């Protein structure tokens, strides 16, 4: 399972992220050895997801946006690349964050 863990940059609830991610993985009947966290390296949910991955001993693949090459389009381009790579996605959205919404 290639799992995007994403969300708003203000998201900081480590315990909620851990609980929801682990519950989702259990629901999918996947072992941790078959999980790879996919991260867009943004502050907030993305980096908390990376941290969960490292602590849990799963692989972590990062997709940093290339701001120099793509300018303002870098975020959406990175998001599309992540979506094409991943098999699953969990988003911690506050109902406001435009980046998390996309």
Question: Positions of the model-derived regions?
Answer:
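Acidic/glycine-enriched connector segments
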Residues: 2-3, 10-102
């Amino acid at each position: 399972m290639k799992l995007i863990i994403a969300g708003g940059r203000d998201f900081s609830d480590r315990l909620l992220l851990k609980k929801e991610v682990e519950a989702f993985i259990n629901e999918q009947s996947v072992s941790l050895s078959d999980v790879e966290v996919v991260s867009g390296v943004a502050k907030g949910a993305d980096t908390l997801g990376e941290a969960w991955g490292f602590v849990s001993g799963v692989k972590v693949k990062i997709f940093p946006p290339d701001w120099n090459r793509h300018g303002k389009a870098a975020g959406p381009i990175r998001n599309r690349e992540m979506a094409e790579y991943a098999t699953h996605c969990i988003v911690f959205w506050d109902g406001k964050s435009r980046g998390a919404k996309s």
